[in-house]
């Protein structure tokens, strides 16, 4: 059985990156929530 996690920096950034979050309304909600919580890193 192959391992399901095959790391790729590009894929990671495209799906979970800052610009990906900013692109949708809900993504912006995620960032707002993380800012409110005081997260050091808002996105990957």
Curated annotation (Swiss-Prot):
Biological process, per Gene Ontology: translation
GO cellular component: ribonucleoprotein complex; ribosome
Presence of keyword Nucleus: no
Protein name: Large ribosomal subunit protein bL34
Native source organism of the sequence: Hydrogenovibrio crunogenus (strain DSM 25203 / XCL-2) (Thiomicrospira crunogena)
PROSITE patterns in the record: RIBOSOMAL_L34
Keyword field: Ribonucleoprotein, Ribosomal protein
GO MF annotations in UniProt: structural constituent of ribosome
Family to which the UniProt record says this protein belongs: Belongs to the bacterial ribosomal protein bL34 family.
A Pfam family the protein falls into: Ribosomal_L34
Lineage of source species: Bacteria, Pseudomonadati, Pseudomonadota, Gammaproteobacteria, Thiotrichales
Source organism, top-level taxon: Bacteria
């Amino acid at each position: 059985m192959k391992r399901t996690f095959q790391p790729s920096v590009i894929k990671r950034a495209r799906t979970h990156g800052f610009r990906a979050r900013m692109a949708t309304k809900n993504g912006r909600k995620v960032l707002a929530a993380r800012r409110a919580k005081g997260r050091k890193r808002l996105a990957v």
